[in-house]
């Protein structure tokens, strides 16, 4: 338990405006929810493990019913806020929630509000 606390404290405080802007969209909020339980919301992938590597942007685009460029812009905002991480495998980008930053963001929201 102490290790968890220590790790949470070493996570830099996220930029509130960037995080709030990133989640100020129904589609991005939906993606954040899906990424909580990727094996429940996405089929197995040829490349990359859903849990370890994240979800391929092409699968997110398909599930949202949007084009690849549209999902790339949504994911760019989530990644730049720090709420999501991106990992390249071959020509694909895989996305995963950044739980330490999400915890720091929610903690900071409680403190600020």
Protein language model features and the residues they cover:
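N-terminal leader segment of winged-helix/HTH proteins
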Residues: 1-34, 80-81
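N-terminal helix-turn-helix DNA-binding core of bacterial DNA-binding proteins
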Residues: 18-21, 27-67, 89, 93-100
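Base-recognition residues in the alpha-helical recognition helix of bacterial helix-turn-helix
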Residues: 72-74, 91
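Short, Lys/Arg-enriched C-terminal cap helix and immediately downstream tail that follows
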Residues: 82-84, 90-91, 107
């Amino acid at each position: 338990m102490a290790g968890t606390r220590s790790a949470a404290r070493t996570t830099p405080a996220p930029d509130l405006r960037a995080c709030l802007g990133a989640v100020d969209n129904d589609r991005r909020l939906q993606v954040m929810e899906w990424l909580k339980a990727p094996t429940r919301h996405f089929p197995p992938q040829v490349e990359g493990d859903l849990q370890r590597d994240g979800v391929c942007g092409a699968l997110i685009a398909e599930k949202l019913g949007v084009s690849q460029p549209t999902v790339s812009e949504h994911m760019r905002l989530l990644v730049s806020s720090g709420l999501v991480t991106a990992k390249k495998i071959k020509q694909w980008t895989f996305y995963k929630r950044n739980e330490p930053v999400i915890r720091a963001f929610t903690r900071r929201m409680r403190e600020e509000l």
